[in-house]
């Protein structure tokens, strides 16, 4: 095993309801896809180890758990994110138009120390639908928006077919790691509430 | 909206969020709404700008205090007993995975005009000036009795039925002095007044055992733990649990109006011209003001400081209990302090709270003994609010209203209210007998 320290990176996935955020996460982590749409139930955060060159990263990928549907994500969801993935559906213009809102909401809630350079990645999902015939957002338009927001990396994906998903998450991992501060941030020593130490016995049995 | 739910929860206070989480896990279809655009309701944690807006009516706080987002100022400051009911709820629901905790540095008590540490180890107990040598011996015997007491083992009862013998009579058997009784009753058993002395001793003994177990659990300087980023994390964590199990969340919904049918049973909730139907409503008192009655007022001072509370050995997180008798009041006063070490303020800043039940028409003045313990203060705010309890009959109208949070700096009453409401709503008892050692063993697999 590599003696290098393992890096835990928090990645959050934002976007309108129904664009495929949960499916992307499941495709990447579990290699699964479900056609049955239900506003997200049961999705939480998932972790996956990613090896890039000789380095191992642990990605902690946070889904919105459906709370984005009525703009009801709390500040705790955003805290500590190392990279923000913005997802839209290439077949739904409104989901692309709302990327701006999601990006701004993230910057307000997360308050990163360097907002100009915080790493975003944009995914245009569902490129498989109708063999591409119902597409309404052109790749050119999407790339132009990404360029205008500080050259955000852009990937076109299909969670259903697994197209480009790994490449997208590799980019996400690299950018998240670049954002990780060099010096260790102030980390209070926390305790494990769910585990805990064996209780000290009171009085000996002898 | 314009849908049908089994339960609609109004207000995202901690109690409401725990219930929302539990009910969603049970498979009920839950809609959870709040008039604010943030989670927590009256139990939220505010950033600096939110604090300024609420108490000063200004949009922006002074720049010299640091970044607004670095502050998480609790509106309901409480510490968690490490082995207490709230920890058991967190473990039962697996909500601990969304949270990080740190032990609280110290627990202190105000006795004879001085702040004294509540001993956390036998060594500290021996050195403590709280008791003289002979009193320590008597207290040691009492603590041993409590430690050994097992309701199911009559040999440990020493001939006393704690379901009948009062606390006062039990303590009299050990010959303890007034100040010791005060210290044990308020700083260890965490009673908020002296009524317990005339009640059966069982409750007090169980509380003392909980204190000892919590102290032993993480072997810190106190029996308390507290989440990083403040208590506002707790409602959000339970809300996420609810969402993961299908709960629907709508913040920023003004004027949530509860609708009733001709029989007086709840039928739905209307907001912004849309109505969601439901069978039951769960809410905090502010959403159904005609079904609650006032039961008192809480007075609280909130201070931003640049130093720890004096005489607490530079503790970065600390509780000081001021027993009622020491102040000549009817109920205790609580001082609670946390800081950048729990990520609730920028580096070098401390947030302190002084809380008590208001007993006069001049609550701010009542808080002065606690404020005097703080030392120099950068900013001071006062929050005086009424407490309510429900007076409706849930079996008739299907409305389940929580009781307002009290002034104590621990969560016992909060969880008891939640558990009682859960039973009323579902007819089921929540089994919280989490085996903490089993949790540890499971983790090691």
UniProtKB/Swiss-Prot annotation, chain A:
* Lipid attachment site numbers (S-geranylgeranyl cysteine): 204, 206
Q: Name one GO molecular function term.
A: GTP binding
Membrane-topology annotation of the record = Lipid-anchor
Instruction: Identify the main location.
Output: membrane
Q: Which UniProt keywords apply?
A: Cell membrane, GTP-binding, Lipoprotein, Membrane, Methylation, Nucleotide-binding, Prenylation, Protein transport, Transport
User: Which residues are recorded with the post-translational modification Cysteine methyl ester?
Assistant: 206
Q: Where does GTP bind?
A: 15-22, 63-67, 125-128, 158-159
What GO cellular-component annotations does this UniProt entry give? Golgi apparatus; nucleus; plant-type vacuole; plasma membrane
Residues forming coiled coils? none
- Signal peptide range in chain numbering: none
Biological processes annotated in GO? protein transport
Task: Name the InterPro entries for this protein.
Answer: P-loop_NTPase, Small_GTP-bd, Small_GTPase
Compartments in which it is found:
Cell membrane
Record Gene3D superfamilies: P-loop containing nucleotide triphosphate hydrolases
Motif (Effector region) spans which residues?
37-45
- Family, per entry: Belongs to the small GTPase superfamily. Rab family.
Report the function annotation for this chain.
Intracellular vesicle trafficking and protein transport.
What name does the UniProt record give this protein?
A: Ras-related protein RABG3d
What organism does this protein naturally occur in? Arabidopsis thaliana
Q: What is the lineage of its organism?
A: Eukaryota, Viridiplantae, Streptophyta, Embryophyta, Tracheophyta
Swiss-Prot record, chain B:
What are the recorded Gene Ontology BP terms?
Answer: protein transport; small GTPase-mediated signal transduction
Tell whether Glycoprotein is among the UniProt keywords. no
- Molecular functions per Gene Ontology: GTPase activator activity; Rab GDP-dissociation inhibitor activity
* The keyword Zinc-finger is annotated on this UniProt entry: no
Q: Which UniProt keywords apply?
A: GTPase activation
**Which SUPFAM superfamilies does the record cross-reference, listed alphabetically?**
FAD/NAD(P)-binding domain (SSF51905)
Taking the record's annotation, the residue ranges forming a coiled coil are none
> How would you summarize the oligomeric state and partners of this protein?
Interacts with the GDP-bound form of RABA5C (via C-terminus).
Its function, per the record, reads: Regulates the GDP/GTP exchange reaction of most RAB proteins by inhibiting the dissociation of GDP from them, and the subsequent binding of GTP.
- What this protein is called in its record is Guanosine nucleotide diphosphate dissociation inhibitor 1
What is the native source organism of this protein? Arabidopsis thaliana
